[in-house]
Every structure is written in structure tokens, then in C-alpha cells.
């Protein structure tokens, strides 16, 4: 019975997680809401971080739908597992993805562990993604699912894109494990956003018309460059045109730029109004390499790329095969050939050249709508 399952809902103070909690309550589950207090911007150096308002909004919604509400303090774990990863990556010239790491390490990591330690069967979030049960093959036992108490193979779970393709957030879950997915619930994954807003308004939820957050995971409405300026020292160097080696100016630090970036480089376009784009970084002299934004700009487009730190939600892909990939959030899935080189690395051959594949970012692998896993651009 649904009522036998106790679920802890990660309530961010936004409308998505509010409706997630509401739907689970309506379905008869034993629901408790919790706000993860991961960052409070105590030094006020990075601008607006509305955590206090978010807690109040989440608390108001919990009261409205009649569920218990808690605040779970995970600030130390967030700094150690997400902020440190973020700052270390940028300091090494990479372009990390804090949202994906936050999901793996915090939301479905330490928060999930906290929930299990406090008697919850599962956690739920407001992600636009869908979790489906995959029945085991009774001839070949499902190793990933393990065994039931009676010795029969246990089910495994697959992660599908959200039904609303404009809001799909499966990409951000690319590094989850089967164990993490087993304990996850995504109550709104089948809903289009307008329908979700309608449900929130009809229920009179305090967050029904609250705008969606666009900031860094759990930090708030903060631009990445502002965050980096607060915590990573400037390391100036030359801006160099890759095609002829001409120095065009100076930059404040390579960590402020990523491959494919056009805005904020700090050098004007030419007389034909052609914009410059970042095509690389040269660590030896801290040079930022740029070129005019053309299809033939050196280093801007890649047909082949290597990925490492492979992570699979289900059975690992161990032989060369055709898959689809999402090279960054909101980009469409594109066809590729996956060629494994080891358990943790692979060569990727795209059917068409891809733009701006920055080292440190995540490539998510799909089989149709099913998310298989992901890897990090080398």
C-alpha cells in the first residue's frame, strides 16, 4: 500500500517541489517535507542568495498541504563535495558542472543517506524526469538489482526524460547510480509545466506563481562569474588570436571563460561585426585563445572526443555501439558512436561535429528517451 511508504520530499521553496509533495500526499503516502540548508552566503560577497525566503516558502507550502516540515543542515558536506569540486575544477582550467555533482553527491547522496537513517523509504524531488521499473530477466538474473528475499532477481529501474521536453531535467541526473535511483521518486515527471502551475494554483499553494530559479544549485540567483570572483584569485594573461598568434588584450583569469563562450570576452568584434569566441586555453603562458565565430574556427568544433569517469545508471555499455548523447543541458540528443577503451574511459565519435565541448563538462548518454549514464569530457 502506498501509505506504508514514508517519503522525504526535498522542498526547495519552488513550485516544482511543492507540487511533488502535494501529489504524493494526495496519493496516500506518508510525506514529510525537508529543506536542504546547503549554503547561506554568510559573507554576502556574491549577491542575492534568498535561502531564508526559500525556507519560509517551503514551510508555508508544507503547512498548506498538511505535512511535517524539517530543515536538514548539509552545509559542510555541500562545501566539501560541490563547492570544492567547483573551485578546484575552474582553478585547473576545467568547466565543472555543479548541478550534476550536487545531485549525485548531495541530493541523492548525503540527503538520501540522512533520509534512510531517519526511517524514510525514499526521497522525492521536483525533477522533470521519470523513473520506471524494469522487470528482471528470470533466465539471466539482474546483477544490478540484486536478489529478493526469496532468491529471485530483483527489479532494476530506468530513468526516462520528463514528459515535458522543454523542461526535461534528466541530463542533470546523468551520474546517478542504480542504488540512488532505486530510492528516488519523481512525482511531477509526467506533467507539462503549464499543468503543474494549474495544479499549484487550484490548490492555492504559496509558490504557485513563483518564478523558476536560474542560479547555481542551492546557491541561488548568482552568476557563475560573480561566484568565481569571490573565491578564486585573478590570474591575468594575454588574449591571443589562435589563427595568427596576435595578442588582442588581457583577461582576468582563464577560469572566467569556457570553450565556445562569446559574451564577456572583453574584445570588440571586427569591422564586419564578426564576434570572437573562445576556442582554447594555453596553460603555459595563461593565454586565452580566441577566433572569429566561424564553423572552421580552430578547436571550436569536434567530431571526436574522449570522456572519462564513466558512470552508468544500469548495466554498463562495454562494447562499441550507436547511442545518442546530450552534450549540454537543453541541447537535443545527437547520434554518436560509443567506443569503450576501459571501464572508465571511452572514445566518442559524433555523427556531426559538436560545438564547444569544454573539458570538465558532462556528456549524457541515451538510448531513445532512456538515460543510460554519463561521462566527463577529457
Swiss-Prot record:
Disulfide bonds: 102-217
Gene Ontology MF, one: tRNA binding
Enzymatic class: transferase
Function: Catalyzes the 2-thiolation of uridine at the wobble position (U34) of tRNA, leading to the formation of s(2)U34.
UniProt-listed Pfam families: tRNA_Me_trans, tRNA_Me_trans_C, tRNA_Me_trans_M
Reaction it catalyzes: S-sulfanyl-L-cysteinyl-[protein] + uridine(34) in tRNA + AH2 + ATP = 2-thiouridine(34) in tRNA + L-cysteinyl-[protein] + A + AMP + diphosphate + H(+)
GO cellular component, as recorded: cytoplasm
Family: Belongs to the MnmA/TRMU family.
Site (Interaction with tRNA): 127, 361
Domain of life per record: Bacteria
Protein name: tRNA-specific 2-thiouridylase MnmA
GO biological process: tRNA wobble position uridine thiolation
Residues the record lists as binding ATP: 10-17, 36, 126
Active site (UniProt): 102, 217
Listed NCBIfam families: PRK00143.1, trmU
Region spans: Interaction with target base in tRNA: 97-99
UniProt entry keywords in alphabetical sequence: ATP-binding, Cytoplasm, Disulfide bond, Nucleotide-binding, RNA-binding, Transferase, tRNA processing, tRNA-binding
Enzyme Commission code: 2.8.1.13
InterPro entries per UniProt: MnmA-like, MnmA-like_C, MnmA-like_central, MnmA-like_central_sf, Rossmann-like_a/b/a_fold
Region (Interaction with tRNA) location: 167-169, 328-329
Main location: cytoplasm
Naturally occurring in which organism (per UniProt): Opitutus terrae (strain DSM 11246 / JCM 15787 / PB90-1)
Amino acid at each position: 500500500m502506498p501509505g506504508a511508504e514514508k517519503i522525504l520530499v526535498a522542498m526547495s521553496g519552488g513550485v516544482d517541489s511543492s507540487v511533488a509533495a502535494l501529489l504524493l500526499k494526495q496519493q496516500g503516502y506518508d510525506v514529510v517535507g525537508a529543506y536542504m540548508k546547503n549554503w547561506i552566503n554568510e559573507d554576502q560577497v556574491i549577491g542575492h542568495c534568498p535561502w531564508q525566503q526559500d525556507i519560509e516558502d517551503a514551510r508555508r507550502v508544507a503547512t498548506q498541504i498538511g505535512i511535517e516540515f524539517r530543515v536538514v543542515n548539509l552545509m559542510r558536506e555541500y562545501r566539501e563535495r560541490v563547492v570544492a569540486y567547483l573551485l578546484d575544477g575552474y582553478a585547473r582550467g576545467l568547466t565543472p558542472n555543479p548541478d550534476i555533482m550536487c545531485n549525485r553527491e548531495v541530493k541523492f547522496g548525503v540527503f538520501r543517506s540522512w533520509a534512510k537513517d531517519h526511517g524514510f523509504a525514499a526521497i522525492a524531488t521536483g525533477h522533470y524526469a521519470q523513473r520506471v521499473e524494469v522487470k528482471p530477466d528470470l533466465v539471466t538474473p539482474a546483477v544490478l538489482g540484486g536478489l529478493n528475499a526469496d532468491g529471485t532477481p530483483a527489479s532494476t529501474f530506468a530513468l526516462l526524460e520528463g514528459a515535458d521536453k522543454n523542461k526535461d531535467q534528466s541530463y542533470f541526473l546523468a551520474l546517478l547510480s542504480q542504488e540512488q535511483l532505486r530510492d528516488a521518486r519523481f512525482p511531477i515527471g509526467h506533467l507539462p509545466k503549464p499543468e503543474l502551475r494549474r495544479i499549484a494554483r487550484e490548490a492555492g499553494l504559496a509558490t504557485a506563481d513563483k518564478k523558476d530559479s536560474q542560479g547555481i544549485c542551492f546557491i541561488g540567483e548568482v552568476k557563475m562569474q560573480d561566484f568565481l570572483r569571490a573565491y578564486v584569485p585573478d590570474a591575468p594573461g594575454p588574449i591571443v588570436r589562435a589563427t595568427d598568434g596576435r595578442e588582442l588584450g588581457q583577461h582576468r583569469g582563464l577560469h572566467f571563460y569556457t570553450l565556445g563562450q562569446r559574451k564577456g570576452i572583453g574584445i570588440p568584434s571586427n569591422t564586419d561585426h564578426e564576434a570572437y569566441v573562445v576556442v582554447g586555453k594555453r596553460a603555459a603562458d595563461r593565454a586565452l585563445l580566441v577566433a572569429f565565430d566561424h564553423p572552421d574556427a580552430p578547436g571550436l568544433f569536434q567530431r571526436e572526443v574522449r570522456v572519462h569517469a564513466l558512470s552508468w545508471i544500469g548495466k554498463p555499455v562495454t562494447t562499441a555501439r550507436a547511442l545518442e548523447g546530450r552534450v549540454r543541458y537543453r541541447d537535443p540528443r545527437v547520434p554518436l558512436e560509443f567506443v569503450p577503451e576501459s571501464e572508465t574511459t571511452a572514445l566518442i565519435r559524433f555523427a556531426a561535429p559538436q560545438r564547444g565541448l569544454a573539458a570538465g563538462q558532462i556528456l549524457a548518454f541515451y538510448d531513445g528517451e532512456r538515460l543510460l549514464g554519463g561521462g566527463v569530457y577529457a
